[in-house]
Curated annotation (Swiss-Prot):
Keywords: Fimbrium, Plasmid, Signal. Belongs to the fimbrial CS1 protein family. The gene is csoA. Induction: CS1 fimbriae are only expressed in the presence of the positive regulator rns. It is found in: Fimbrium. InterPro entries: Fimbrial_CS1-type. Residues 1-23 form the signal peptide. The keyword Protease does not apply. Fimbriae (also called pili), polar filaments radiating from the surface of the bacterium to a length of 0.5-1.5 micrometers and numbering 100-300 per cell, enable bacteria to colonize the epithelium of specific host organs. This is CS1 fimbrial subunit A. Its main location: other. The keyword Signal applies. It comes from the Bacteria. GO terms for cellular component: pilus.
Length: 171
C-alpha cells in the first residue's frame, strides 16, 4: 500500500516538473485614460483609433475626408459637452517640416478650433441609441486641405501631424 502511494506521488511529481519546464510567462502592459464624467468613443463602443491614414487623390488634387462614427458617453445626460482642439492641426512633411498642410476637424457637423464650442444635450440625443447616457451617433471628420499648403508647393512625401480633441461636460 505504501509502495503504491510512493509510486503515485513520484509520478505526479514528475508530471508537474515536466509541465513546469514547458511553461512560458507573457506580460501585457495595459493602459487606460479615465474621466468618470465624459468620454468620446466609436459608435461600436471601442476607443478612438490612435492613428488614421488620410488618402490623397491625384484625380481631385486633394485629400479625402476621414470620418469616424462616434458617441458621447456621460454620467449626466442633462448636460451637453464642450469640444475644442488643443492646437490647430497641420500635416508637416517629414523631410521638410516647413511644408505644412492645414487640417480641419468637424464634430457633430460643426467645425472645431482651439476655442470650445458647446453642443447641447438635446442635439446629442442621449438615449436615442437605447442606452440612457449614450448619445446618438455623431460624425468626427478629419480633412487635410492640399489647396492651402504653406511653406512651398505640395510635393510627394510622407506627412504627419496630430489632432488632439478636448471634450468636457458643459456646466
Amino acid at each position: 500500500m505504501k509502495l503504491k502511494k510512493t509510486i503515485g506521488a513520484m509520478a505526479l511529481a514528475t508530471l508537474f516538473a515536466t509541465m513546469g519546464a514547458s511553461a512560458v510567462e507573457k506580460t501585457i502592459s495595459v493602459t487606460a485614460s479615465v474621466d468618470p464624467t465624459v468620454d468620446l468613443l466609436q459608435s461600436d463602443g471601442s476607443a478612438l483609433p490612435n492613428s488614421v491614414a488620410l488618402t490623397y487623390s491625384p484625380a481631385v488634387n486633394n485629400f479625402e475626408a476621414h470620418t469616424i462614427n462616434t458617441v458621447v458617453h456621460t454620467n449626466d445626460s442633462d448636460k451637453g459637452v464642450v469640444v475644442k482642439l488643443s492646437a490647430d492641426p497641420v500635416l508637416s512633411n517629414v523631410l521638410n517640416p516647413t511644408l505644412q498642410i492645414p487640417v480641419s476637424v468637424n464634430f457633430a457637423g460643426k467645425p472645431l478650433s482651439t476655442t470650445g464650442i458647446t453642443i447641447d444635450s438635446n442635439d446629442l440625443n442621449f438615449a436615442s441609441s437605447g442606452v440612457n447616457k449614450v448619445s446618438s451617433t455623431q460624425k468626427l471628420s478629419i480633412h487635410a486641405d492640399a489647396t492651402r499648403v504653406t511653406g512651398g508647393a505640395l510635393t510627394a512625401g510622407q506627412y504627419q501631424g496630430l489632432v488632439s480633441i478636448i471634450l468636457t461636460k458643459s456646466t
